[in-house]
Design a protein with these regions (language model features):
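Short coil-to-helix segment of the ABC ATPase nucleotide-binding domain corresponding to the Q-loop/switch region
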Residues: 9-18
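ABC ATPase signature
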Residues: 11, 53, 66-67
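Hydrophobic anchor residue at the start of the ABC signature
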Residues: 19, 63
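Conserved ABC ATPase signature
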Residues: 49-53, 57
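A short, proline-enriched helix->beta-strand linker immediately N-terminal to the Walker B motif
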Residues: 68-72, 78
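Helical segment within the ABC ATPase nucleotide-binding domain
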Residues: 89-101
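Short, glycine/charged-rich "phosphate-handling" switch motifs in NTP-dependent
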Residues: 121, 133
Length: 152
């Protein structure tokens, strides 16, 4: 899932979801029903142009489109970018739920506190080099991480 959502703004919500699916129509219908169950707001707006959705709804659409391909893993690049604090919490709850359903999430995120709070394992990069790695909860409590990335 690329940074900045990258939806197709002139297409409807439903058309955007179809872009992420395989071509088997029956399978696509089942997967779309699953996405709509996870994101009821998208179902309410399925005929609406994607470019008119709020930032949070566009992020939900980007996640939904990624899920349409029934992936084993999703790379998410800055999913909280440009969202209000309330929507950030909502998106991170969605990421956690997707992961609980067996999909591996590789999360690239500057909001270290939120990312560490929902992660199992974490890596800290500085100028492209891994400087720390380990259990996310341990890193969340690490004094070096707190000082450098969590403002504590």
């Amino acid at each position: 899932m690329p940074e900045g959502r990258h939806i197709f703004p002139q297409m409807t919500v439903e058309e955007n979801l179809e872009m992420g699916a395989f071509t088997d129509q029956a399978d696509m219908a089942r997967t779309m029903a699953d996405v709509y169950e996870r994101f009821p707001r998208l179902k309410e707006r399925k005929r609406q142009l994607a470019g008119t959705l709020s930032g949070g709804e566009q992020q939900m659409l980007a996640v939904g489109r990624a899920l349409m391909g029934k992936p084993k893993m999703i790379l998410m690049d800055e999913p909280s970018m440009g969202l209000s604090p309330l929507l950030v919490k909502e998106i991170f709850a969605i990421i956690r739920e997707v992961n609980k359903q067996g999909i591996t999430i590789l999360l690239v995120e500057q909001n270290a506190k939120m990312a560490l709070a929902i992660s199992d394992r974490a890596y800290v990069l500085e100028t492209g080099t891994i400087t720390l790695s380990g259990d996310a909860q341990e890193l969340l409590n690490d004094a070096r991480v707190k000082k450098a990335y969590l403002g504590q």
